[in-house]
Amino acid sequence: MSNRLTAPPKKEFQSFHNFPIVSDLDNFKADIAFLGIPFGDPYSMGEASNDQCNAPTHIRRYCERALRGLDRYDFDIGGTLLNGEDVKVVDCGDVIGEAKDVAGNHDRSEKAVRKVLASGAMPIILGGDHAIPIPVFRALENHGPITLVQVDAHIDWRDVFHGVSYGLSSVIRRASEMNHFKEIF
């Protein structure tokens, strides 16, 4: 496996809203950076994975229709989406994953988010399953204090589930253990 953390978005849909694609996370400048974390099952990607691993591709595909014409007037915000501002937006592609290497996938995801943050860009994560916030939360350790608002049907407070402590059932529990989270609602 190479040292690259990300791969370009699938050619079929290209980048989010055709924003420039960034392949070198160590050398880019942007205000906003889209990053796909396409993992579909935090317990065993090969055994019972689901379609959540395709979410970044589908988000890019279906948002294209909604985002046509960034210069169009939006009544909700009282102007155009970027409002004539010189905002540089890029798409960093998807974090490269390996089936059966959940811990490695989380490590690569955390490293990729850290690199986006180090560039000065605000990361917008296109995910995958409910476990992907954990590496994103870890990457935010120098950006606190953070107030987290969880909107979900269940609390995601398990310590360990199926032998995994960094899965989709443990997201809020893991956040509560991180010093940079001030409050969780």
PLM segments and residue spans:
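Conserved alpha-helical scaffold segments that buttress catalytic/binding sites
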Residues: 2-185
